[in-house]
């Protein structure tokens, strides 16, 4: 599964494995148990996308169980 890209610092969850989805020198920090990953420092740059927006799946609401 591929999560949506990070935009502003600390705003969106992101996938930290593989290529750096945060971009522009920003880093992704892993949250607890693989959840709540965040990009830090400024705005991230979107990862190159294919033609289908459907390739990027939004994180389901139930991923926010704390």
Swiss-Prot record:
Glycosylation-annotated residues: 45
Entry's Gene Ontology cellular component terms: extracellular region
Chief location of this protein within or outside the cell: secreted
Domain of life: Eukaryota
Keyword Phosphoprotein assigned: no
Spans annotated as Disordered: 39-66
Coiled coil stretches, renumbered: none
Region (Interaction with thrombin active site): 1-3
GO molecular function list: serine-type endopeptidase inhibitor activity
Keyword Methyltransferase: no
Cellular localisation: Secreted
Name of the molecule in the record: Hirudin-PA
Lineage: Eukaryota, Metazoa, Spiralia, Lophotrochozoa, Annelida
